[in-house]
Amino acid sequence: MAKVLYVKANPKNNEESRTFRISEHFINEYKKAHPEDEIIELDLYKENIHFLSKEEINTIMSKDKSNLKDHPVLKYTYQFAEADKYVIATPMWNLSIPAILKAYFDYITVTGITFKYTENGAVGLLKNKKAVVIMSTGGEYLTPPFDQWNFASTYVTTMFKFFGVEDVSLIAAQRLDIIGEDVEKRVSDAMKEAEQLAKQF
């Protein structure tokens, strides 16, 4: 049985969020294909996620964290490390990700748990895992010339690889705010892509 951590980074509900329409469809199809797996839903806007304080930074940078699994910050780090698969559902906001998702990555980027330093630099500790990033964008930022403005999926994908997760897929519904676009078709196309990926994820 695999443990899937489903991280949601949007204050909107499932019906209002175009991202969540896609990610919820992915999760539902995944459950059909993998009924034995455990899905852990983590809605960041329903958690006490905040910017790290000086005291919290000192704690997570301490050498011995083995007895801190219930710490308000480190509990998220250990939860992340213990998962086998990851689903990140996020919109692109202002060319990047919502601040709460960045704060979450600060929570889970902890040496000795998700990565470590060696004489050759940082090495990820989360090997043999996989992730999918589900994203919606108002414009088109995955292809030239505006791909260089994409600090959303590139950041999330890079963080996964920093943790050692090399198998990272991306499902993106783009151009959702472009005048004249058939938004429903673009969302529907992304849902179809999600449905196919869910079966083999």
UniProtKB/Swiss-Prot annotation:
Q: What does this protein do?
A: Quinone reductase that provides resistance to thiol-specific stress caused by electrophilic quinones.
Under the subunit heading, UniProt states:
Homodimer.
Residues annotated for FMN binding in this entry: M92, W93, N94, L95, S136, T137, G138, G139
Q: What is its EC number?
A: 1.6.5.-, 1.7.1.17
Q: Which InterPro entries match?
A: Flavodoxin_fold, Flavoprotein-like_sf, FMN-dep_NADH:Q_OxRdtase_AzoR1, NADH:quinone_OxRdtase_FMN_depd
Q: Where is the signal peptide?
A: none
Task: Alphabetically list the UniProt keywords.
Answer: Flavoprotein, FMN, NAD, Oxidoreductase
- What is the protein name given in its UniProt record? FMN-dependent NADH:quinone oxidoreductase
Quote the HAMAP family the UniProt record gives.
Azoreductase_type1 (MF_01216)
> What's the record's note on cofactor binding?
Binds 1 FMN per subunit.
Question: Which species is the source of this protein?
Answer: Coprothermobacter proteolyticus (strain ATCC 35245 / DSM 5265 / OCM 4 / BT)
Catalytic activity annotated for this protein? 2 a quinone + NADH + H(+) = 2 a 1,4-benzosemiquinone + NAD(+); N,N-dimethyl-1,4-phenylenediamine + anthranilate + 2 NAD(+) = 2-(4-dimethylaminophenyl)diazenylbenzoate + 2 NADH + 2 H(+)
Q: Name one GO molecular function term.
A: electron transfer activity
Pfam families per UniProt: Flavodoxin_2 (PF02525)
Q: Which cofactor does it need?
A: FMN
Which regions form coiled coils? none
The family annotation for this protein states: Belongs to the azoreductase type 1 family.
